[in-house]
Amino acid sequence: MWRLPPKSNANAKVLSRWLLFVGLGIAGWGTQLALPPVSGWFLAFVGIVPLWWQCQVLAPLWAAIAGLCWGWGFYGSSLVWVWDLHPLTWIGIDPVPSWLISRGIWLCLSSWGAVLSGSWALLMARYGVRRSAPWQLLWGVTLWCALEALWSHSPLWWISLSLTQSPGGLVQLGRLAGPTTITAVVMTVNGLVTLSLRQQKWARVGLAMTLVAAIALNGVLSVRVMADRGEPLRVGLIQGNIPTREKLTPEGIRRAWQVYLQGYHQLVSWGVDAVLTPEGALPILWQPQQMNPITEAVREAGVPLWLGTFMETAGGSHQVLLSLDGNGEIDSHYGKVNLVPLGEYIPPWLGGVVQRLSTLRSPLIPGDPEQVFTTPWGNAVVLICFESAFSHRSRWQLVHGGQFILSVANDDPYHRQLMTQHHGHDVLRAVEGDRWLVRCTNTGLSAVIAPTGETLWLSKADEFVIYAATIFRRQTETLYTRYGDWLLPLLLGMLSLSVLRQRGWH
């Protein structure tokens, strides 16, 4: 189905190009089924084969278009949760403009992902497929890993090929060099399958060896996780279940005070050591000098509270997780670094068009990328919402002493697709850092994740939930924590060597 004649015989096409591009879009959609919530992780090992094949037979421009079509199928279907933004009538936007806005944002995000796969296809058709088969494999793997690394530093980053292996696939490989390890293995298998179809006998042997080695290494890394030592830490979490369209109203704020105060008292009676709330649990500007029911309750119980709220700063406000000690005083806070585009900040060039999308009365300011969140039990890694997708955000905090991970999010108004993808990101972060992770959300899915990546408890969505989690502090180091993404520079170095050798031969 996917085979086309050589470039020199383009007039004798087996398939018309429009049908080819539709087929590539379907292939991208099929690869998306490897992501949560379906989590058919094995599909990722063949999902890019049709695109790789076409890079070998299409001219660079047509290959780029093919990559865009595959990307729209993959990223477009994996980001359908953006549609849940509609309706936005609760912030004064009429139904039709609301529908158009949600689809426009989805199209923008999908296209940004499609540019990644389109760029990969363009570079492969222009440079990669001109090499011998082993070097072509290196080009394909390295280019995709490099593009993902570049995209991961953009404000629109969310979907990585590594997410296809979470929570039940080859997640343990993330201990070696973070998401790049998993992405590299997925791309290697796709490349070897493609080359095998072109009658490359060595590729079939390499394919079998790669699959066996990856699965075996994943198993070995899982069973070699060090046992927990020391005293357990009991963390209570409160899933408030107050929809955003409600909690930003006076009645919603009143309900938030009531719900989180009630949950705090209940968890304290269960004997927890600390209590965790979701992102923006109290959607107000926190005033440290003023007494309120929360600080009074903390002073009375003496149990620390990690509270999601907002704090005023010069020029705006921070989305923060506060650490209130047993006296109700702020002893540490973490300001959200990676703000959600359009929802939490408006790019200047879009300000006049979509300013009404924001419900904020003052602009949110990103937090300092180099923050340390201290607790009575040592430093903790904090990930607020969107930050779960950025592995470098958690790694920096791990290097600076993070002993467990606190992931807090709102996740409303989005439903199961986004919730499970977000949970999948947190599984990757727990495994990469070899840390216990407590995930607390407003509407679900809250969770407790072990350093092995196993989800020990998962809440139901759209319900009020309180839960007491037992976790352990850890000070172990994975290769990724110690050395970061060392694999990508290695791949780039090998790629540079291949280019130099090629020039030397000429």
Curated annotation (Swiss-Prot):
Transmembrane domains' residue ranges: 10-30, 33-53, 57-77, 105-125, 139-159, 176-196, 205-225, 483-500
Pathway, per record: Protein modification; lipoprotein biosynthesis (N-acyl transfer)
SUPFAM superfamilies reported for this sequence: Carbon-nitrogen hydrolase
Entry-linked PROSITE patterns: CN_HYDROLASE (PS50263)
Subcellular location: Cell inner membrane
Catalytic residue positions: 279 (proton acceptor), 336, 385 (nucleophile)
Pfam families tied to this protein: CN_hydrolase, LNT_N
Enzyme class: transferase
Topology class, membrane: Multi-pass membrane protein
GO biological process, alphabetically ordered: lipoprotein biosynthetic process
Keywords: Acyltransferase, Cell inner membrane, Cell membrane, Membrane, Transferase, Transmembrane, Transmembrane helix
EC number: 2.3.1.269
One term under GO cellular component: plasma membrane
Family per record: Belongs to the CN hydrolase family. Apolipoprotein N-acyltransferase subfamily.
NCBIfam families given in the database record: lnt
Protein name: Apolipoprotein N-acyltransferase
Gene: lnt
